From Swiss-Prot:
Protein name according to UniProt: SPARC
Result when mutating residue 166 to A/L/K: Strongly reduced collagen binding
Subcellular location, principal: secreted
Signal peptide per UniProt: 1-17
Length: 303
């Protein structure tokens, strides 16, 4: 649903706006890197749960049991590949020619890779990455963020401490907005609605707005309980492939890629969350990054 990615960017731009942005260091790729057709992001019943499959270029090709007139019709290929028939009329996935990608409509379709190269679209990026399969360069190449490459300044220590303040407030506001729009849209589950209802009806809730970090810090201290569920909820939205209590680089992509051009501390923040440097962020690490106390971290809140 294209409306969701627009909704995400608008909210992020208003609630997470930071002075400058940060350049991303090269990262060792643990899993096949993320990939997204930004304008074609799929969503499930809950629009905040961006389907990570749209960002994952490492999924295996699968073939449906139903036999169609065109064998390629039900043969799925991962991003960067297209289906072709071999001499036996058997479907197979081959690298897509980048020149066959649709012409980009505008700047918003461009993406930046981690080697600081701008591609006309995610289609062009993945098609190029496919041609490098099996090489060291191809293994390390990944989609860094949405939009053309730009200078992203370093994230200062003082700025890093401000990031979770804005992020927490943003997560709370996203949930409240979804709750207000959820009459017949199934944007939230019934269990989620019960949790968010308490936040929505709390008269002490800080309304959405461009607040100074001092106010955000005071609000978190005074209304701490209001932020516990939003932090757990976002973890659950990202922990999808597989649902194992850990966030991989791929699973972080739906949240991370749109934010990097606007929030220059995004990458450094998520790196600091990985306390044991195993390239995965566990629930304890995630919640701790947002200031949630150990006694309040509860896997049963990931609903």
């Amino acid at each position: 649903m294209r409306a969701w990615i627009f909704f995400l960017l608008c909210l992020a731009g208003r609630a997470l706006a930071a002075p400058q942005q940060e350049a991303l260091p090269d990262e060792t790729e643990v899993v096949e890197e993320t990939v997204a057709e930004v304008t074609e992001v799929s969503v499930g019943a809950n629009p905040v749960q961006v389907e990570v499959g749209e960002f994952d270029d490492g999924a295996e090709e699968t073939e449906e049991e139903v036999v169609a007139e065109n064998p390629c019709q039900n043969h799925h290929c991962k991003h960067g590949k297209v289906c072709e028939l071999d001499e036996n009329n058997t479907p197979m996935c081959v690298c897509q020619d980048p020149t066959s990608c649709p012409a980009p409509i505008g700047e918003f379709e461009k993406v930046c890779s981690n080697d600081n190269k701008t591609f006309d679209s995610s289609c062009h990026f993945f098609a190029t990455k496919c041609t490098l399969e099996g090489t060291k360069k191809g293994h390390k190449l990944h989609l860094d963020y949405i939009g053309p490459c730009k200078y992203i300044p370093p994230c200062l220590d003082s700025e890093l401490t401000e990031f979770p303040l804005r992020m927490r407030d943003w997560l709370k506001n996203v949930l409240v907005t979804l709750y207000e729009r959820d009459e017949d849209n199934n944007l939230l589950t019934e269990k989620q609605k019960l949790r968010v209802k308490k936040i929505h009806e709390n008269e002490k809730r800080l309304e959405a707005g461009d607040h100074p970090v001092e106010l955000l810090a005071r609000d978190f201290e005074k209304n701490y309980n209001m932020y516990i569920f939003p932090v757990h909820w976002q973890f659950g939205q990202l922990d999808q492939h597989p649902i194992d209590g850990y966030l991989s680089h791929t699973e972080l992509a739906p949240l991370r890629a749109p934010l990097i051009p606007m929030e220059h501390c995004t990458t450094r923040f998520f790196e600091t969350c990985d306390l044991d440097n195993d390239k995965y962020i566990a629930l304890d690490e995630w919640a701790g990054c947002f200031g949630i106390k150990q006694k309040d971290i509860d896997k049963d809140l990931v609903i």
